[in-house]
């Protein structure tokens, strides 16, 4: 690592043979109902999991540190939506979703005993991420009744997403955006 003047700050390689064995089952269930030919209503709930990755526990920047107690994220996700095709011209998928993470991995600024301020990567807190997504696709070939040997469509995709930490043992995190 070099400073802004090009001087060598640190040239150190640390080897690790750390192993994190895991064994688990993730469960989920989904349902759908089609009250009309052009409309399907669906919902899903499932457990989610994100393991600590190599990039979570390896750093090259001396301004970053890794919390030695970093653990995997666990939680669940829910979604509810409607989708379908209207007159073979317009297809759509509109959904609401929520993801809940226990012990979400992230960075926090920390003051260390030597007075240095560093970004520490570790488990920040419990987080919820929620939003709305939509996709509307217009089949231009069907709309203009053109030969089916060709394909062309126009689509609009939107997402509205918000998130926040619901609980954390770290001061100043609860209620903040993820």
Regions found by a protein language model. Give the residues of each.
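Signature of Gram-negative outer-membrane beta-barrel scaffolds
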Residues: 1-36
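Outer-membrane beta-barrel translocator domains and adjoining extracellular loop/strand segments
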Residues: 2-10, 54-61, 104-112, 146-148, ...
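Extracellular loop and loop/strand-boundary signature of outer-membrane beta-barrel proteins
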Residues: 8-18, 62-68, 77, 117-124, ...
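Transmembrane beta-barrel strand/turn architecture of Gram-negative outer membrane proteins
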Residues: 22-35, 74, 78, 153-161
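Exposed loop/turn and edge beta-strand positions of beta-sandwich/beta-sheet ligand-binding modules
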Residues: 23-25, 64, 76, 118, ...
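Generic recognition of flexible, low-complexity loop/linker segments
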Residues: 29, 67, 142-144
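Membrane-embedded beta-barrel scaffold of Gram-negative outer-membrane proteins
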Residues: 32-34, 38-46, 50-52, 56, ...
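Gram-negative outer-membrane beta-barrel transporters
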Residues: 91, 96-100, 118-178
């Amino acid at each position: 690592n070099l400073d802004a003047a090009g001087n060598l700050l640190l040239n150190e390689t640390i080897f690790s043979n750390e192993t994190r064995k895991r064994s688990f089952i993730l469960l989920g269930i989904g349902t759908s109902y089609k009250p009309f030919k052009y409309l399907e209503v669906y919902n899903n709930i499932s457990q989610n999991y994100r393991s600590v990755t190599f990039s979570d526990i390896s750093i090259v920047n001396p301004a970053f540190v890794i919390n030695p107690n970093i653990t995997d994220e666990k939680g669940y996700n829910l979604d509810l939506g409607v989708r379908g095709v209207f007159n073979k011209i317009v297809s759509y998928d509109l959904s609401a979703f929520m993801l809940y993470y226990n012990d979400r991995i992230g960075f926090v600024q920390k003051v260390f005993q030597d007075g240095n301020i560093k970004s520490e990567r570790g488990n920040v807190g419990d987080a919820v991420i929620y939003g709305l997504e939509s996709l509307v696709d217009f089949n231009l070939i069907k709309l203009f009744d053109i030969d089916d040997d060709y394909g062309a469509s126009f689509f609009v995709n939107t997402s509205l997403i918000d998130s926040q930490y619901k609980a954390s043992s770290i001061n100043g995190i609860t209620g903040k955006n993820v």
